[in-house]
């Protein structure tokens, strides 16, 4: 049985919120002096915000990325973020430098796993219905 309880609107809010927190994380968690940790967090945060802006969901602007693709991207970004302390060699820095990357990365994987690829809204546009071969909801 598949458990998908985070709807696309909540997913959008989480995308922008987590992206912004990652951009600010070097100063929030005081690892702005660890260059690799700082730039990975900022880069991934900006990538998450850009992906959210381009996703075809309620809070997307360009609506170019289908939601199911977005969720796969979230899981991959999460895995990259969780592994980044070892990939970029800052795992031996203080816990404040590597732990946020691991925790947020694993959370991203989990969020992607329990997020619905289908919007709850009733106003699916024609392109979405054709793309996913789903009838409009009554």
Model-predicted segments: where are they?
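Membrane-helix boundary elements
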Residues: 18-38
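Structural signature of hydrophobic alpha-helical transmembrane segments
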Residues: 37-47, 102
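Membrane-helix boundary/interface segments in integral membrane proteins
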Residues: 48-65
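Hydrophobic alpha-helical membrane segments
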Residues: 70-85
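Membrane-helix boundary connector in multi-pass membrane proteins
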Residues: 83-100
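Membrane-water interface at the C-terminal end of transmembrane alpha helices
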Residues: 88, 108-125
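Short, highly charged, low-complexity non-transmembrane loops/tails of multi-pass membrane proteins
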Residues: 124-138
């Amino acid at each position: 049985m598949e458990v998908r309880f985070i709807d696309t609107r909540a997913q959008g809010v989480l995308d922008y919120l987590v992206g912004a927190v990652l951009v600010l994380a070097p100063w929030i968690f005081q690892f702005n002096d660890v260059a690799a940790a700082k730039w990975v967090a900022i880069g991934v945060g900006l990538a998450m915000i850009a992906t959210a802006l381009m996703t075809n969901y309620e809070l997307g602007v360009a609506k170019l990325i289908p939601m199911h693709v977005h969720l796969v991207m979230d899981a991959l970004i999460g895995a990259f973020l969780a592994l980044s302390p070892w990939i970029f060699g800052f795992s031996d820095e203080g816990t404040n430098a590597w732990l946020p990357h691991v925790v947020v990365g694993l959370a991203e994987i989990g969020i992607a796993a329990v997020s619905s690829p289908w919007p709850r809204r009733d106003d699916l546009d024609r392109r979405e219905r054709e793309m996913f071969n789903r009838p409009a909801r009554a």
